[in-house]
Regions:
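N-terminal glycine-rich FAD/FM-binding segment characteristic of electron-transfer flavoproteins
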Residues: 1-224
Length: 224
């Protein structure tokens, strides 16, 4: 048709060369962002720890909690009893309350250093604000407001299920070529673990340059 068209109305554009897919080897483990307010872990985080333990059995990996704040040591045992095998802990007075920039900066540094396979976060105001920034910075996809999570048995990738088209269908989304696989999960759709006081875990304390904790915005007041 192209050769026969005397008006040259038809063309075939050459496909642009595609970028090479990133190397996803070496990414391992499930991370849960442990959302805290006033030094107390929010219940959605415990729900995600419980679900993560189910997923971890299918992946043969650890579940780690990411805890950013200040004076949080009194919460550590409870976090381990409720499902965390490891806790990555970053504490400083400037991190007492959530702020987008420093929390994002810390998360990016931790991902670069430890390379998690999956990152889960509550679909809360804080969770949505933080994890979307992280995903954009590392150029991976993010499935929002999940109501179901599972592991595909053959390729061992995260199945992220969420309502779509106004809730008329349930869509299952996968991210086979990029790591970490990231999702936010709705509150009260997952079951927390029963606390097991015999569980043991590892605390990894991380310290970064103070410049990483600086925010261009100033928190004036928290209104409940």
């Amino acid at each position: 048709c192209i050769d026969a068209c005397k008006f040259k109305a038809l063309i075939i554009e050459k496909l642009r060369p595609t970028c090479a897919l990133p190397d996803i080897k070496g990414y391992k483990g499930i991370w849960v962002f442990l959302e805290q307010k006033n030094g107390k872990i929010q219940s959605v985080s415990y729900e995600l720890l419980g679900k993560s333990q189910e997923l971890a059995k299918k992946l043969n990996c650890d579940v780690s909690g990411i805890l950013i704040g200040n004076n949080m040591d009194d919460q550590l045992n409870d976090i381990i009893h409720r499902g965390a095998d490891n806790i990555y802990l970053v504490q400083a007075p400037e991190l007492q309350n959530f702020q987008d920039e420093p929390y994002t900066n810390i998360f990016l540094k931790l991902i670069e250093k430890y390379k998690p396979e999956i990152i889960l976060c509550g679909a809360t105001a804080i969770g949505r604000s933080l994890i979307s920034r992280v995903a954009v910075n590392i150029k991976v996809g993010l499935t929002a407001d999940c109501t179901g999570l599972d592991i595909e048995p053959n390729k061992k990738i995260l199945l992220q299920t969420r309502p779509a088209f106004g809730g008329n269908i349930m869509a299952t989304i996968i991210s086979p070529n990029y790591r970490p696989q990231m999702a936010t999960v709705r509150h009260k759709v997952m079951q927390p673990m029963e606390p097991d006081t015999k569980r043991k875990g590892k605390i990894i304390r991380e310290n970064f340059d103070a410049s990483l904790y600086v925010s261009r915005t100033k928190l004036l007041e928290i209104v409940e």
